[in-house]
Amino acid sequence: MTKKLFDLQGKNVLLTGASKGMGLSMAQGLVNHGANVVISSRKLDQCQKAADAINESSGQKKAFAYSCNASSKEELQELVEFSIAELGSITTLVCNAGVNSFFGSMSEIDDESYDKTMDTNVKSNHWLINMVTPSMKESGGGSIMITSSIAAFHASETLGTYSISKLAVLGLVRNYASELGPSNI
């Protein structure tokens, strides 16, 4: 039997951007180590397919599906409420949802595309953190992780807004770490 590097039994994770790719791999890994996970993305059918596959491979119902547009504050609040109803609490928040809504020069980007990238990649994380931290503080702490990108460290002639958003995520993380660290988050 292979020894696990760590045990996540009893941990309840809300994971955005989790129906495919890196998010799906994170969800599978979290469940493999014992966590319960709410899998969220915009498309419910993809979330459900991911949750079903994870539950089948684990032999337990540890993954739950919920569709949510990460750029909608109301939908994020509903996601948090669903997660607490299904899991009992949220001990860990993993913000993995992200978009690049424009490929081209910064001088050519329209306001709508700029706002969509910043809202999804930055503002949604800010909202979610503020939605989950009160209960984390009450329970003595928690964990918050936000996916950034190497793009945060490099200028790009075609991915400028995405790069800006991922650099902003790093600032968000540093500031929340300073603010929430004393609360064991």
Model segments located where?
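Active-site helix of classical SDR
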Residues: 129, 165, 173
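Active-site loop immediately N-terminal to the catalytic Tyr-X3-Lys motif
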Residues: 106-107, 154-160, 182-183
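Alpha-helical segment proximal to the catalytic Tyr-Lys
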Residues: 134, 178-182
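Substrate-binding pocket helix/loop in short-chain dehydrogenase/reductase
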Residues: 104-106, 110-115
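Conserved glycine-rich Rossmann-like NAD(P)H-binding loop of the short-chain dehydrogenase/reductase
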Residues: 33-49
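Conserved glycine-rich cofactor-binding loop
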Residues: 12, 19-21
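Residue(s) in the substrate-gating loop at a strand-loop-helix junction
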Residues: 149
